[in-house]
Structures are given as structure tokens and as C-alpha cells.
């Protein structure tokens, strides 16, 4: 039997469909894999294990879904907005933002439950979530979130986020000081069922938010813990109008210094462009900078599903994809607006992502991601929308419900599948890299896998964009939804800093066998990485674990398996293909 030593040097096709098993004639076959789970394809062709996720905090109400929305003033001043059922919270620098009013602690009892006394009236109500820090003596209560109970004007009892009393009978004695503050939270009009239909566009410190059941809202930031919702004042001379029931827009974007709305219930194919630079002015006219209204003419009523602004305005509808430009290659004006249809795939009601000058959108059936891009030369070219899942149709089974783009370090489009599986698409078209990989987040929900419900990304100045997610699990027999951030592990990083656990926390300090602060994983059996090496699993009790041997650096959280399997090798044979022939 002839010897063969095939080299697998690149995996830029990622995981490919079982339907292509043995299809060695396909160009991407040698770069494909039959399974790639919890591994990320790098643009250079190699693969690396997915880093774990760091626990940042619990959402406002774990009994209902929430959605994460990014807010970026500049790359060094960014926030994650947690929209819940008629609530909004804020994360900055991986921490939940607190109210501006801080109360001073004057007492903490060694009792069950611990009773906190403040220097004056605290103003809290039963069930409010607070954060305690810097208490002297009774350091066990520091750096944690609590729900308050048994409220009087200057005292309250501590319960944990599972609703159980915090037993302080074995804590060290309180001596002095400490602060308590409430988690910053404001009310919104948006219910749980409406959250994933919200669309938004941001200019500086103001975000414009639309939903077909509500008037257009502005969300304005004046400080880390000072955010204000208001109705946008719209000056218009319609019809069609934007300011009454069934006439509220469902999509929004900025384009050529205009605020653009689209798709009301009464006018699903209509676009409204504000006056240039005056975002509340929709008073139409014939001057070049006047507002304008444009209705797409078609044989069918296909509602507008998304707007994507690059050099042109891409308009995705339920029946096809359009490009809006000017008739004279100048700015769009009331007299020069031109819209052309380029494809008939139809789009799902899911926000697309922009990668360079390309718009990636989810097709109407939610199984395909298409790449809407310009092809050809300037004079005779047009737009096409090839299928990015053609070699891996199986990875999107069940449908995609959300997307987010992480530009650095590896140019990955992240997707949430309907069953809560996280999908990744390493996408670098200029290098012909289109590689799918799937990710099962550690932990369980009910009797199945942990469920990813929302994702968002933020840019940074450090060269590593950040991916945030909400993960639903069953923790200590209770449904919990946690906000987590995927960590980063680069080539050359010290193995002792490896973070390959989910919903985890890390420790760095003097050698210890006792790790605390794991209250969010109470009762769960966790994986431990100590000084870069695996450690026997430990179960959390009273928020802590005891290690079998001391560590100066540790990461603790849910473990997960990373798997990679090649396709059947095509190494050739003396009489043709090696497929179907005995091997040893």
C-alpha cells in the first residue's frame, strides 16, 4: 500500500456541510472541516481555541429576556445598554453603572440576615438592587450586588441575587466605613416582546430609537449615570405622516447628513429623509437640502426591513434589495433621488452588519446570510448578493435571530441561532476567507445547553474589539441570565493568564487555596485553571471554592469542550482517488 503524507495547512473554509463529504472536486474541500466547535478560524488559515467568557453581572430581571445595544461616543468612551422589560441599565468598562447618590454605611450586623445601617435615609425599597464596597472589618460583603429587604428609613437586610438571606454570623466583625449605591436603572416604554424589533441610529451623545408601536424616541447621555428618553419633535407637512398611531417608523439610519426613517404600518414601502443637518425637520420642499419622502414602486407590497448606509443607501425589503443614490452622482436631493432593485431574495427582520463596503444581511427564511456588494466597474457594474452559507447550510439550521460584527482581531461576524447556539463567521473576502464555526457556551439550561439570547460588540483602542452576550442558564435550580464578555487570548500570551472557562472570574495575587466571589455560580461544579494548568473540578459553596493546591493565578467557571475534525483525506492513489479505498 502506497504511503501518503498530506499536509493540512489552512482551514479558511471552516466547517462545511455533511452534504459535501467526499466532494474532493470542490476547491475549498482541502480547507474545510467536518466539525469545528468552540474553535475560531483565524484569517491566516489556522484555528485556535475560543477564549472563555467573563461574568460581568446579572440582568435586571432574569425572568424575562433582555437585549444588549452598543452605544459609542468614541472608541475610548463606550457603553453597553441593557434593555429589559420597560427598563434600561448601563455597563461601562465592564461594570454596571451606579446611581450618582452614594450612601455611607455606619453598621453591619453579624446576623442572618446581615442588617446594614446607613448614616441617613437611604431611600431604597424592598427588591432594589444595590452594590456594597469598602466596608471595614466585614470585608466579606464588599464587591457584591444584593437585593434589599426589610427596609426601614436607615436600615435594610441583605439577600443575595437568588433571594436567600445573606448569613453573616461567621463574617468578620464590621469596624467602620463602607458605601452602598443602587444600580442605575431608568424606565422605558419597550416591553420584552418589542426589544428585538428596536432599531437605532446614533449621532454623538444622542441615539434615535424606532419601533412601529411607539413614537420616535431620542436617548441622550449627559453623564455615565444620566440618560434621558424623550419623543423626537418632528416638524412635517405630510401626508404621509410619522407622528400618529400606525404611522411610526420601524427602521432608521443616517445617510448624507440626513436622518432617514422607513416602513410605517400604513406605509411599509415609504422612506422619509430629514432636512440636511436638521434631524427633526421633515418639512418637504424642492430645495436641495429640503426633506423628502420617497415610496418604492413595485408590483407587491414588500415592507422595508433594513437600511444600510455606505456610499449608497441599501434598502432591504421582504421581497428584494434596492440601492438608493442620486441621478447625478451628487448628494440625494428631492429632485435627484434614484432607487434601483438589484436582487429578489428578500430580507428577514434582522439588522444587517457592515463589513468595509459590504452589507451582510439575513435572507427572509433566516437560514442564509447574503453578501450585498458592488461588482464590476463603475460604469457598467451592479450589485450582487451571493450566499455565504452555501458550503455550510447546516450551521444555521433553526434560523439566525441576531448578528454583530467584531472587526478586531480576526474579523468575525457573530450570529445567534434560534436555539441559543453562538455561530461565528470569519470573513475576509479580500483573502477569500469565509469560514463558519459554532460555539456552545458552558453551563446548562434546563436539560440542554446554555442559551445565548443577545449579542453586541464594542470597538476599543487596544486592537481587540469586545463581544458581549446575555446567556441563560439554570444555576442552583434557578433560571439566571448573565451578561458576559468573551475574553481575548493571543499568541505569545503567558499560559498562566489563559481564560478557557465560561461565566468565569479570575484571580491574580499571592498564593492561595481559597477563592471567593463566585456567588453567581452557587452550587455549580466548575472547572479551575490554576497557574495555567488544569485543576480538579470544584463545587461552589457560600460563594467560594477550596483548591487542592495553591495558585497565584486562576480562572474559574464552566468548562467547555473544543473539537476540530478534518474531512476525509484525499491523498490520491495509483489508480485515481483515495476515496472509498482501504486505508491504514
What are these regions (language model features)?
Residues 2-23, 27, 95-202, 210-215, ...:
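Small/polar beta-strand repeat architecture
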Residues 2-102, 185-197, 202, 299-304, ...:
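Beta-sheet repeat architectures centered on beta-propellers
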Residues 40, 78-99, 262-290, 324-334:
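Beta-propeller domains
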Residues 80-93, 154-164, 211-233, 266-273, ...:
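Short, surface-exposed terminal/edge motifs of secreted or surface/virion proteins that either
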Residues 85, 204, 213, 224, ...:
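Surface-exposed loop/turn positions within WD40 beta-propeller blades
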Residues 182, 238-242, 281-299, 380-397:
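Surface-exposed acidic, glycine/proline-enriched linker/cap segments
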Residues 244-245, 269-297, 341-350:
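Beta-sheet-rich non-transmembrane sensory/scaffold domains
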Residues 329-367:
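Catalytic or ion-translocation cores adjacent to nucleophile or general acid/base/metal-coordination motifs
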Amino acid at each position: 500500500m502506497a504511503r501518503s503524507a498530506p499536509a493540512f495547512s489552512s482551514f479558511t473554509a471552516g466547517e462545511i456541510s455533511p452534504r459535501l463529504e467526499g466532494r474532493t472536486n470542490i476547491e475549498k474541500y482541502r480547507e474545510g472541516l467536518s466539525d469545528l466547535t468552540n474553535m475560531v478560524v483565524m484569517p491566516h488559515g489556522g484555528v485556535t481555541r475560543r477564549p472563555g467568557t467573563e461574568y460581568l453581572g446579572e440582568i435586571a430581571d432574569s425572568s424575562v429576556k433582555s437585549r444588549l445595544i452598543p452605544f459609542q461616543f468614541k472608541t475610548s468612551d463606550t457603553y453597553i445598554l441593557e434593555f429589559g422589560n420597560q427598563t434600561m441599565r448601563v455597563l461601562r468598562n465592564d461594570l454596571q453603572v451606579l446611581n450618582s447618590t452614594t450612601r455611607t454605611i455606619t453598621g453591619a450586623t453579624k446576623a442572618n440576615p446581615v442588617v446594614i445601617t446607613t448614616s441617613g435615609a437611604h431611600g431604597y425599597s424592598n427588591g432594589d438592587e444595590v452594590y456594597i464596597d469598602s466596608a471595614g472589618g466585614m470585608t466579606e460583603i464588599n464587591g457584591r450586588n444584593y437585593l434589599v429587604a426589610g427596609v426601614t428609613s436607615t436600615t435594610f437586610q441583605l439577600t443575595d441575587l437568588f433571594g436567600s438571606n445573606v448569613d453573616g454570623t461567621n463574617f468578620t466583625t464590621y469596624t467602620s466605613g463602607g458605601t452602598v449605591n443602587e444600580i442605575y436603572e431608568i424606565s422605558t416604554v419597550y416591553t420584552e416582546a418589542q426589544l428585538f424589533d428596536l432599531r437605532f441610529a446614533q449621532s454623538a451623545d444622542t441615539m434615535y430609537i424606532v419601533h412601529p408601536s411607539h413614537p420616535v424616541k431620542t436617548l441622550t447621555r449627559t453623564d455615565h449615570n444620566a440618560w434621558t428618553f424623550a419623543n423626537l419633535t418632528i416638524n412635517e407637512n405630510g401626508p404621509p405622516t410619522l407622528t400618529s398611531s400606525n404611522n411610526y417608523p420601524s427602521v432608521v439610519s443616517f445617510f448624507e447628513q440626513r436622518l432617514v426613517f422607513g416602513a410605517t404600518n400604513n406605509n411599509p414601502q415609504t422612506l422619509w429623509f430629514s432636512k440636511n443637518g436638521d434631524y427633526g425637520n421633515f418639512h418637504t420642499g424642492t430645495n436641495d437640502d429640503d426633506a423628502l419622502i420617497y415610496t418604492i414602486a413595485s408590483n407587491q407590497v414588500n415592507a422595508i426591513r433594513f437600511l444600510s448606509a455606505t456610499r449608497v443607501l441599501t434598502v432591504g425589503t421582504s421581497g428584494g434589495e434596492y440601492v438608493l443614490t442620486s441621478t447625478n452622482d451628487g448628494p440625494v436631493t428631492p429632485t435627484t433621488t434614484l432607487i434601483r432593485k438589484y436582487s429578489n431574495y428578500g430580507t428577514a427582520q434582522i439588522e444587517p452588519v457592515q463589513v468595509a463596503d459590504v452589507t451582510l444581511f439575513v435572507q427572509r427564511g433566516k437560514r442564509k446570510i447574503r453578501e450585498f456588494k458592488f461588482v464590476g466597474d463603475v460604469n457598467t457594474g451592479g450589485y450582487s448578493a451571493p450566499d455565504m452559507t452555501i458550503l455550510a447550510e447546516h450551521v444555521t439550521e433553526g434560523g439566525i435571530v441576531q448578528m454583530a460584527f467584531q472587526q478586531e482581531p480576526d474579523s468575525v461576524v457573530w450570529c445567534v441561532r434560534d436555539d441559543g447556539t453562538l455561530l461565528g463567521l470569519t470573513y475576509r473576502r479580500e483573502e477569500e476567507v469565509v469560514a463558519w464555526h459554532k460555539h456552545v457556551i458552558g453551563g446548562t439550561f434546563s436539560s440542554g445547553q446554555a442559551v445565548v439570547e443577545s449579542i453586541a460588540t464594542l470597538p476599543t483602542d487596544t486592537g481587540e474589539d469586545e463581544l458581549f452576550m446575555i446567556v441563560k442558564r439554570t444555576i442552583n435550580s434557578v433560571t439566571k441570565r448573565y451578561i458576559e464578555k468573551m475574553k481575548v487570548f493571543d499568541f505569545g500570551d503567558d499560559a498562566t493568564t489563559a481564560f478557557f472557562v465560561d461565566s468565569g472570574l479570575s484571580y491574580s495575587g499571592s498564593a492561595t487555596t481559597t477563592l471567593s466571589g463566585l456567588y453567581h455560580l452557587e452550587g455549580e461544579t466548575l472547572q479551575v485553571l490554576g497557574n495555567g494548568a488544569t485543576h480538579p473540578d470544584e463545587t461552589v459553596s457560600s460563594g467560594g471554592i477550596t483548591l487542592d493546591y495553591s495558585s497565584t493565578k486562576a480562572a474559574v467557571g464552566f468548562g467547555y469542550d473544543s473539537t476540530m475534525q478534518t474531512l476525509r483525506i484525499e491523498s490520491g492513489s495509483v489508480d485515481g482517488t483515495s476515496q472509498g479505498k482501504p486505508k491504514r
